[in-house]
Design a protein with these regions (language model features):
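A residue-level marker of the well-folded mature domains of exported/periplasmic proteins
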Residues: 1-245
């Protein structure tokens, strides 16, 4: 029986035949590129910016793509000393968040803010891999940070986070239209039912420990205050009432 892993890859199982997901490396790249543009890092000169990091569950293979994709963009600025992490918490396992939990993200950032930013040090940017962790960061900032609001990334366009984008409490989120993923998965199932090859566009990236799994990667999109209306409301993904409730 063919098995299609949906969005999250099943690891260490030879039962998985195909994988339908988003281009998770590109999710991280988009977050990194947003930070570069928002801070104009290419023209930073001798300026330095303080950055902190948070990603998701250490058992979720996707964090490797989200986090590493973003770091691939930011690394030159880290190496040049333009981006500095006052907490020193930079390793993926250190900045991971069990179960992607908002309360755990909030608790960790409240500790970071108290330990490294309570003296007036400016926090310039937080690379958050997704919206549930970004929400925890935003909650921590609201409760215990008095500096200029940092650039804050996210992913998923959860309703609470889109509200934060509108309110200026989150800079961006990467939109992964689940309608696209569902539609592509249906195509894959239909092909298998007909005895034909399902659509795939990646045969190199996703190794679940038993081999590379043929995958279809849907395209993620940046969501900001400038395009959320078109991307989320006009497309029918959310209604105005969803965001005003």
């Amino acid at each position: 029986i063919p098995v299609i892993a949906y969005d999250r890859l099943i690891m260490n199982s030879d039962a998985v035949c195909y994988y339908a997901t988003f281009d998770n490396w590109d999710v991280g790249v988009k977050q990194g590129e947003y930070i570069v543009d928002a801070l104009d890092l290419e023209n930073a000169g001798d300026k330095t910016y303080n950055i902190e990091y948070i990603t998701g569950d250490p058992g979720d293979n996707n964090i490797n793509f989200f986090f590493d994709g973003a770091i691939s963009v930011l690394q030159p600025y880290i190496d040049a000393g333009t981006l500095v992490c006052p907490s020193g918490q930079t390793e993926k396992q250190t900045v991971a968040t069990a179960n992607w939990a908002t309360d755990a993200a909030q608790a960790r950032f409240e500790n970071i803010l108290a330990s490294y930013y309570s003296d007036g040090t400016q926090l310039d940017v937080v690379l958050a891999s997704n919206d549930s962790t970004a929400l925890g960061v935003a909650n921590a900032l609201a409760s215990s940070y008095t500096g200029n609001y940092p650039v804050l990334t996210g992913q998923d366009c959860d309703i609470a986070n889109v509200k934060n984008i509108v309110a200026g409490k989150q800079s961006m989120s990467v939109f992964k239209d689940t309608r696209d993923l569902a539609s592509k998965t249906v195509e894959m199932v239909d092909a298998l039912m007909k005895g034909t090859e399902p659509p795939v566009n990646d045969t190199e990236t996703y190794d679940n420990g038993t081999g590379v799994i043929p995958s279809y990667l849907c395209e993620p999109k940046d969501c900001t205050i400038d395009n959320y209306q078109e991307l989320l409301i006009d497309s029918g993904y959310y209604t105005e009432a969803d965001l005003n409730g």
